[in-house]
Amino acid sequence: MSAKRAVKDKATSAAGLVPMIVAYFGKPGSYSHEVAARRFPRNAVLKSCRMISDVFEAVTRDAADYGVVPIENTLGGPIYDTVDELIRQNEPPIGLTVCEELSLHIMLSLLGRKTTPPKRIYSHFVPLKHCGDWVRARYPGAAILEAESTSEAVERAASEPDAWAIGNRGAAAMHQLHIIVPKLGTRAENITRFYLLGRHAGVPRSATHTLLVFGLQHRPGSLVVALQVLQKHKINMTRIVSRALPHNPEEYLFLVECEGAMNQPHFQKAFAELTVKSRHLRSLGSFRVVEKFE
């Protein structure tokens, strides 16, 4: 956040004149929208972004105070568009930081018009992967079609008279659709985790986790050596994702989330040691993990 805007916010927020701007991935009614609305229930303007990269850009350019992006789904795995944008933050100039981790228990619903049997049922590939068999068995005459997101699927169902969608039940009222089946899913728990992005320096006192990004020399055992540093300092790793460098596919960058904060002495020692045993090491923020939204 720019100094000018920060001063303006501080001077006028008490009077409610300048609302906070929160960018989120997807359209109104998406799960990112729901998380943003529940995290900032008052005095915030929620800004829809078509692409995950647009959320990063909005916060980077000070067009938004915060951004909400998905990082991982328990059924679908990592959200690689978010991973790639985070890894790009390893390149100077210093970009964003992760301020919080949020999570949402995903409740998939079948949405449509009760008066019209479906000829097409839309959804994102992850819900279709886990609910598709049930939908095909229940509605054998409907074509099951993939959309870019559940919010886009709901929009298609709203614009096509004989189409339904699998998506967020919160989007039904926005698009004048009925909730045909309130809860779809499998026995597996369906949770999506999100990062709250900002440009705040420093480490919050409530921080419990840190996100690191680094590269390694292209030689056997280099990743093991790096992870042994965390083990040595009793730092628990909670997430690791690797991505090949676009200009050199034989080399990888690693995004590592671990327990601990940059203001803790044992973590500082581990960071200093890891600096020697890795390449381009950077902290993308120490943050707290917020209670899951049900």
Predicted regions and their residues:
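Domain-level signature for soluble enzymes in the chorismate/prephenate branch of the shikimate pathway
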Residues: 1-294
